């Protein structure tokens, strides 16, 4: 389990990589982090251990484009997502509507961490 801060994810991911390197397991083909903070901490750990595996994040935070390598990530329109969430909450409370599946589009922002 990796903590969702850059510092904690760095430490946790570094520990994970050290165990992976010491063991006989093969290195994964790629890593996908649940958010950009975890991915950025993982990038630092991989750099220190000379591990070169593609990694992606999620959220497209501003730091993602400034890291080295710059982070490939998934961008979600958070403003739209918030608007839809508020609208659905109001509808749910006022009309007692059933659960509705809503799909929100995303965009892959390809940067250097997957090259």
Task: Cite the ranges covered by each PLM segment.
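Flexible loop/turn connectors
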Residues: 18-115
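Structural motif
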Residues: 1-24
């Amino acid at each position: 389990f990796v903590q969702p801060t850059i510092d904690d994810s760095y430490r946790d991911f570094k520990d994970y990589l050290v165990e992976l390197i010491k063991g006989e397991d093969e290195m994964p083909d790629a890593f996908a982090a649940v958010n950009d903070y975890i991915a950025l901490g993982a990038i630092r750990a991989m750099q220190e251990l000379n591990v070169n595996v593609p990694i992606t994040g999620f959220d497209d935070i501003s730091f993602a484009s400034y890291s080295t390598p710059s982070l490939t990530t998934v961008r979600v329109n958070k403003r739209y997502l918030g608007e839809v969430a508020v609208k659905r909450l109001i509808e749910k409370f006022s009309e007692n509507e059933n659960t509705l599946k809503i799909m929100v589009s995303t965009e892959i922002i390809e940067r250097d961490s997957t090259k």
